[in-house]
From Swiss-Prot:
One of its GO terms (molecular function) is protein homodimerization activity. GO terms for biological process: calcium ion homeostasis; cellular response to hypoxia; decidualization; embryo implantation; endoplasmic reticulum unfolded protein response; intracellular calcium ion homeostasis; negative regulation of gene expression; negative regulation of multicellular organism growth. Residues 238-258 have a biased composition (Basic and acidic residues). PANTHER family: STANNIOCALCIN, STANNIOCALCIN-2. Has an anti-hypocalcemic action on calcium and phosphate homeostasis. This is Stanniocalcin-2. Its main location: secreted. The gene is Stc2. It comes from Rattus norvegicus (Rat). GO terms for cellular component: endoplasmic reticulum; extracellular space; Golgi apparatus; perinuclear region of cytoplasm. It is found in: Secreted. Residues 22-44, 236-296 are annotated as: Disordered.
Length: 296
């Protein structure tokens, strides 16, 4: 639940954070030519950008971050791949042997896949972005991101910066994957992002505080620790039902007892009515009155 909330929150933050920069770009840096203007309006990578990226990919090697730099500053606004690559390389020395192997293999996997898939994809920006992020996820999973994160939790948390989540979608994808890597990794990432969010946005990060409190709270409370108000609310229906059954049982028993008592007196009255005289008639009227009260 908390993982879903955090993922939705950072995605929503990413959307709001990109509104103003996008509006500023349109007003201060208009497209230079009709071709670029039409490409941006249709959501396509311009022919010039396509040629530049293809040329860059041919000259870039599999080692390092050269391939990812080819996707910076394009009309589809695919950014963050180069930054996340540099972040991994700068922190590689802090990882253990398994973590270092993951960084080398994952970056090489992404570079190789981007070079071979880019020429086969449509120039539509949504298709290119989906291809880029899908390849990134596949390479992370193929080379076991979770195992590397579980053995290097502190380093992974240090790599995640809240401002990157607001500006670059590859970081959001990375965090969403880390949130599926077990409770220790998920809790560490959530706390780190929450603390950084509170420094930047203050009270707007209360949703993350609620999420973290849910992680720390036991799933169910013991009966003896339930609030008194809750126990009172729970006990009221029970008492009402119990009182209803007791009243019904008493009424039924009283009715049956009164009937048997009445029949007994009727038989006795038939046998000795002449001997009782006025007192017998008075007792009979009293019993009739009690019987009527019970029936009411």
């Amino acid at each position: 639940m908390c993982a879903e909330r955090l993922g939705q929150f950072v995605t929503l933050a990413l959307v709001f954070a990109t509104l103003d920069p996008a509006r500023g770009t349109d007003s201060t840096n208009p497209p230079e030519g009709p071709q670029d203007r039409g490409s941006q309006q249709k959501g396509r990578l311009s022919l010039q950008n396509t040629a530049e990226i293809q040329h860059c990919l041919v000259n870039a090697g599999d080692v390092g971050c050269g391939v990812f730099e080819c996707f910076e500053n394009n009309s589809c606004e695919i950014q963050g791949l180069h930054g996340i690559c540099m972040t991994f390389l700068h922190n590689a020395g802090k990882f253990d042997a398994q973590g270092k192997s993951f960084i080398k293999d994952a970056l090489r996997c992404k570079a190789h896949a981007l070079r071979h898939k880019f020429g086969c994809i449509s120039r539509k920006c949504p298709a290119i972005r989906e291809m880029v992020y899908q390849l990134q996820r596949e390479c992370y999973l193929k080379h076991d991101l979770c195992s590397a994160a579980q053995e290097n939790v502190v380093v992974i948390v240090e790599m995640i910066h809240f401002k990157d989540l607001l500006l670059h979608e590859p970081y959001v994808d990375l965090v969403n994957l880390l949130l599926t890597c077990g409770e220790d990794v998920r809790e560490a990432v959530t706390r780190s992002v929450q603390a950084q969010c509170e420094q930047s946005w203050g009270g707007l990060c209360s949703i993350l505080s609620f999420c973290t409190s849910n992680i720390q709270r036991p799933p169910t409370a013991a009966p003896e620790h339930q609030p008194l108000a809750d126990r009172a609310q729970l006990s009221r229906p029970y008492h009402r039902d119990t009182d209803h059954h007791l009243t019904a049982n008493r009424g039924a028993k009283g009715e049956r007892g009164s009937k048997s008592h009445l029949h007994a007196h009727a038989r006795g009255g038939a046998g000795g009515q002449s001997a009782q005289g006025p007192s017998g008639s008075s007792e009979w009227e009293d019993e009739q009155s009690e019987y009527s009260d019970i029936r009411r």
